[in-house]
Curated annotation (Swiss-Prot):
This is tRNA(Met) cytidine acetyltransferase TmcA. Its EC number is 2.3.1.193. It comes from the Archaea. GO terms for cellular component: cytoplasm. Residues 480-663 form the N-acetyltransferase domain. Belongs to the RNA cytidine acetyltransferase family. TmcA subfamily. CDD domains: NAT_SF. GO terms for biological process: rRNA acetylation involved in maturation of SSU-rRNA; tRNA acetylation; tRNA wobble cytosine modification. InterPro entries: Acyl_CoA_acyltransferase (IPR016181), GNAT_dom (IPR000182), NAT10/TcmA_helicase (IPR007807), P-loop_NTPase (IPR027417), TmcA/NAT10/Kre33 (IPR032672), TmcA_N (IPR013562), tRNA_acetyltr_TmcA (IPR024914). ATP binds at Q260, G286, R287, G288, K289, S290, A291, L292, L293, G294, I295, R438. It is an enzyme of class 2 (transferase). Keywords: Acyltransferase, ATP-binding, Cytoplasm, Nucleotide-binding, RNA-binding, Transferase, tRNA processing, tRNA-binding. The gene is tmcA.
Amino acid sequence: MPDKAEVFFDEGVLDFADVDEIVLDVGEEALAEALAHRHRRMIVFQGDEGKAEAAGVVTAGAADVLFDVRDRPISVLYVTDSLKEDTYARERYEEFRRVLEGFAEEANFEYELEALTFSGSKRALGTTWDLMVIDLSYDLDPDAIGRLVETVRGGGLVIFQTPPFDRWRNMWTAFHKSLVTPPYTLDHVGKRFNRRFIRKLKEHDGVWIVDTDEWTAEPEPSEDVDLEVEVKRRERPDLDPPDDAVLPEELYRMCATEDQFRALIRFEELLESNGKTALILTADRGRGKSALLGIAVAGAGVTTDVYDVVVTASEPENVAVLFEFLLEALRELGVEYDVERDDKGNIVYVETDDFVVEYERPSEASEIECDLMVVDEAASIHVPILERILDNNDKVVYSSTIHGYEGAGRGFSVRFLQNVRKRRDVRLIEFKMHEPIRYDSDDPIERWLFDTLLLDAEPADLDKEDLECVKEMRVEFEKPDLRYWFEDPEGEEELRQFIGIYVMAHYRNRPSDVMVLADAPHHEAYALKTETGKIVTALQVAREGTIPRDVITKMRRGYRPPGNVIPDLMVQHHDALDFPRMKGLRIVRIATHPDIMRHGLGSRALKELAKIAKKKDYDWIGTGFGANEELTRFWLRNGFVPVHISPNRNPVSGEYSVAVIRPISEEAEEIINRANFEFRIKLADWLGETHRDLEPEVARLLFEPMSSLRYRPTLTEGQLRRLKKYADMVHTYEIAADAVRELAKAYFLDTEDRPELSEEEELLLITKCLQRWKWADVADVLGEEVPDLMRSLRDLVGLLYEEYKEDLQRSAAVEGIRKAVERLADKGLTGTVIVEVEEGEPKEVIIRREERLEL
């Protein structure tokens, strides 16, 4: 391949398109810079006419040059909102393809063209392209842009087609239309994200903007640009493996950068270590972490005694690159293998004669013991799962993206690594990869991408004065002006502080979250700021409710109005048809600066939000969260009432989702308290079925009474006799378990005059009686011996029996009467029923004038 290139676009390409020569000038200059620095460059064609042909001209001219430079077919990816026939998007694609195909045939260069829609953009993950064209004429999908732009290699071009900027600033995209929720219309949707996106295109180096209606360019092409350039190429590391290397030399030669080479050495340290060891690999996107892991896993399986390897990530698609390089490494080593794929075509299982590699979802992986556990994109997995994985395995690799659309690696570092570093039983090996694989460092298009999508947003740096403000609670609760944040360059710093807190928090962040905040008509932001002006707590809330009656009628039949999570839940699970017409706020996200957690700032923010809600005549504030003990305690402490728990654990977080609501109005309070009581009744039953694995501490908190309600236990005469005999040490627990369970339910559902039990006693009732755990499992959780727990439970039952004795006898009496009447009715007898009761129990039932039946 030549070391020099003459970046001249053959003017013959203009025969296939009606565009101005300025398109050639811009294309040549952009490609020359890209090749000289092994960076990417971007060209934006904005206008109504000619942009598809202009994109075709630059792509064709660049592909002609690159075919000589690369000495292989040039890969081109075209992405748009739709490829359906008879759409404007398809029409633009065909115009683009006509230019590219026509000139390729004339100039005799080879290329490979693939077209995707934004909805299918995940297919581009792990791929690499020489040239990319993204049609933004109708839609602006931030998540897709985050995935796609990074896949273009150094020396290549990213080309955007957009509407005229003047119109685009005020235009609704397809994404915007998805933000419309009742009672709002499209007219209520903002365009702040569009305007910031345009501003960022103008601010950054390496970006040319061509107006295809006026045929002008900004910046203008330089007249003295040198189009004969030295082509900068990626140099593989000229390094020798360690003399005592465990992994084969062939695998070290596969490393594309020195960082990958060094990371492989650190992986060997993990393999040779004794005891519990964790290797932490962190990097920005596109640094080759996943590829390196695939190479490393192949080496571990072939050359060590590692047999079973488990790979986990939030989705199977996230480990596609890992499996791709695993197979490539096996081929390099001459190892035969078999592959299994899921129904979407993702590799999920690889087997060789020496070892197996299997993909598992995070919640399932956290319960597995294996020789080697690999966690890819750990940032998107909740910390409790990451910790359980380490608890169960001696050799674990955690790979995490620092800046990226899947999650926040720095949040992973802050929360997870802080905990791991405190553990004396874990050896920690850390390595950060800096060198990009596809392009060289300091790439201007990467800087544009990170800035535009706020992938590198960080919380404010807090100095001594800021910390003093927090300590003394000298903070103000503010509702920021989103227009100022997104449209005024001076608002950029506060926006970055706000989003940066979420990046550090437990939320999985995507670029589309920023667009929702910017433009969704029902979303708004609140911030807790120090007197010094630093944002320390960030809240994003969604206005819900005030749903029209005709929509509520549809909801009864299963219709789920978009953007109304809490009202929908209350109708579907509690048949609360008055609730959707009420006005509420759903907390979408709340997070506090990681340096000042547990200072009461989150609670202060919720208190201030409740004041605003009351002042503005809202009826309720609600939210949903992954239920662990700490978060559940936080929400309940702040006056939120649980009304629902999901039937299944989230496959990524491994937690059940709980919905809680804080009533503001009296009308809402009545509905919410009733829903809470019904929820607790259902939870008492679910704990023995769908939620047997719910953390007992969480269950205990969810049972906390939120209002004064009376629950009367119900037992038959037979159950009551067995319960007595169990309390009197005649029966074992198993004989009376059904009756004891009803007694435990009575304790957790009753809120009037119930006895005070300790936390340990309540956990015993939950685990043994409601969740029906084995005695050994209860003992493991409570840290007690089984015989001691047996005695404690019998004593508890005796105490509760005395407390609910009258209710239990009354229920047995009623049950006895019902059965007696049924027996008489079966005989066809009629008359007046007379019940004689002694000490709360029925002694006989009389049918006056006809027959007497002894009980």
